[in-house]
Amino acid sequence: MPRPISATIHTAALANNLSVVRRHAAQSKVWAIVKANAYGHGLARVFPGLRGTDGFGLLDLDEAVKLRELGWAGPILLLEGFFRSTDIDVIDRYSLTTAVHNDEQMRMLETARLSKPVNVQLKMNSGMNRLGYTPEKYRAAWERARACPGIGQITLMTHFSDADGERGVAEQMATFERGAQGIAGARSFANSAAVLWHPSAHFDWVRPGIMLYGASPSGRAADIADRGLKPTMTLASELIAVQTLAKGQAVGYGSMFVAEDTMRIGVVACGYADGYPRIAPEGTPVVVDGVRTRIVGRVSMDMLTVDLTPVPQAGVGARVELWGETLPIDDVAARCMTVGYELMCAVAPRVPVRAE
């Protein structure tokens, strides 16, 4: 019999979250971002819940082909573009849209032999300083793209670095306007944070990612509490043992936690080999039998231990939610000095996953 740990993907929550995007950006089309195997959820598992989108955005050609095989006939955007000239053959065959962010990609499109023009998103580096043409070079890149017979529609694209923070988007939007002055075309700027908090950045296409999965772009669950988003992944397990610690006794590697009084602890079938962060400190929240409690001791490879003081009735077999419908993933991530994105993507292959 398998270990009791499992992850559940909530299809209805995905559809709900897409509808929240549309409420916030009612005049925009939506690229549903499903990179990194749909933020660890599984591309095939999220497809039924997100198929109401206008397009999908991702990184890998293999995942783009998989979407076509799942029956998706609409737009698919390669967010980092392509890396070799042979990739363009796949782009052409499967009618993909690609980002273009450097001269080497432009050169490959100029020399490609295509059955039809490729739609592109011409990316400006407006301040993130990762990918994209500088504002000073953007017009020349746009003119070059317009002159290329292998390029069809050109969408103007940039990416925000601080849409979830105090700096916001105004500075980058102003930078973009300077670099793209006089250039007409559809625009795609807004990530999840901009969808939620910066309506002036919505334009023609929005690119929500983390909000589709029910977590906060800021990493703070309170920031999205009133937005109607629902968690799309629940990681759950069970108690596989219960121990009673006497005052002064410790639990786990390194004896990191010492009981201040007699107490019951539960042993949970979940550890860092399942993708749960080893760095999780004492006090990281968990939910046992519907009651919120805390981790005590160090997370080990296959197990972690929890305080059963708030839930005295819990015994072997009691359900434990590590994050999900009852416990926001952002609350767990915050205690672990990380973000919900990372926890979702880190769920290990050995954890059974099902969609409902």
UniProtKB/Swiss-Prot annotation:
GO terms (molecular function) for this protein are: alanine racemase activity; pyridoxal phosphate binding
Q: Which family does it belong to?
A: Belongs to the alanine racemase family.
User: Which residues take part in binding substrate?
Assistant: R130, M301
The record's section on NCBIfam families has: alr
* InterPro entries for the chain: Ala_racemase, Ala_racemase/Decarboxylase_C, Ala_racemase_C, Ala_racemase_N, Ala_racemase_pyridoxalP-BS, PLP-binding_barrel
Pathway of action = Amino-acid biosynthesis; D-alanine biosynthesis; D-alanine from L-alanine: step 1/1
Instruction: Using the record's annotations, give every residue carrying the modification N6-(pyridoxal phosphate)lysine.
Output: K35
Classification via CDD domains: PLPDE_III_AR_proteobact
Q: Where is the active site?
A: K35 (proton acceptor), Y253 (proton acceptor)
**Protein name as annotated:** Alanine racemase
GO process terms (BP): D-alanine biosynthetic process
Going by the record, the broad EC class of this enzyme is isomerase
Reactions accelerated catalytically: L-alanine = D-alanine
Q: Which UniProt keywords apply?
A: Isomerase, Pyridoxal phosphate
Q: Which Enzyme Commission number(s) are on file for it? A: 5.1.1.1
Superkingdom to which the source organism belongs: Bacteria
Keyword Isomerase part of the UniProt annotation: yes
Gene Ontology CC: one annotated term: cytosol
Q: Cofactors per UniProt?
A: pyridoxal 5'-phosphate
